[in-house]
Amino acid sequence: MGNTVIIAVCTVAIEVVFGCMAAYAFARNRSRLNSFMQSFCLGIMMIPPLSILVGVYTELVALGGINQQWAVIVIAAAFGLPMSIHLYTNFINSIPVALDEAAAIDGAGVLRTFWSIVLPQLKPVTVSVIILKGV
């Protein structure tokens, strides 16, 4: 029970932190590279995990990650991160850009805008990600 809780909490924390930051970059920056990266994330979601299991196992053996908690956490987070990014990106797209512009006019940088304006509004989707990934 203890190992499962540690793995679940660490995996969900990684997915929430990196997912919301990556999604903010995807949602607010419009470029060809961002649309390619979004398509790449969606493409990763379509690959069945069992199809790359042999390659992942080979790399874990080379890295000494067999029977290690960190290996399970990294693999679980890597497989779950595209879905978290997708959920966060769609939610951030519904937040008006005018809020970011108003924060910029008030002198807030990108990190301050994300931390003070966008992140508090991400509570509903964060709860959804925690429920979907933590169960």
Model-derived features: positions:
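A structural signal for multi-pass alpha-helical bundles of membrane permease subunits
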Residues: M1-V135
